[in-house]
Amino acid sequence: MLRTIVVFAPIIAALAWVIFNIQKPAREQFNRDFLGKD
């Protein structure tokens, strides 16, 4: 169990960092396109 946490924690952290960095500009673009039409 502890070994699984040690193995997966950096992977999950890296995935979360990548997803966060992808979503931040995508969300700004989404707000500009979708909310801007109203």
UniProtKB/Swiss-Prot annotation:
It comes from the Bacteria. InterPro entries: PSII_PsbY. It is found in: Cellular thylakoid membrane. Keywords: Membrane, Photosynthesis, Photosystem II, Thylakoid, Transmembrane, Transmembrane helix. It is a single-pass membrane protein. One of its GO terms (biological process) is photosynthesis. The chain crosses the membrane at residues 4-22. One of its GO terms (cellular component) is photosystem II. One of its GO terms (molecular function) is manganese ion binding. Loosely associated component of the core of photosystem II (PSII), it is not always seen in crystals. PSII is a light-driven water plastoquinone oxidoreductase, using light energy to abstract electrons from H(2)O, generating a proton gradient subsequently used for ATP formation. PSII is composed of 1 copy each of membrane proteins PsbA, PsbB, PsbC, PsbD, PsbE, PsbF, PsbH, PsbI, PsbJ, PsbK, PsbL, PsbM, PsbT, PsbX, PsbY, Psb30/Ycf12, peripheral proteins PsbO, CyanoQ (PsbQ), PsbU, PsbV and a large number of cofactors. It forms dimeric complexes. NCBIfam families: PRK13240.1. Belongs to the PsbY family. This is Photosystem II reaction center protein Y. It comes from Prochlorococcus marinus (strain AS9601).
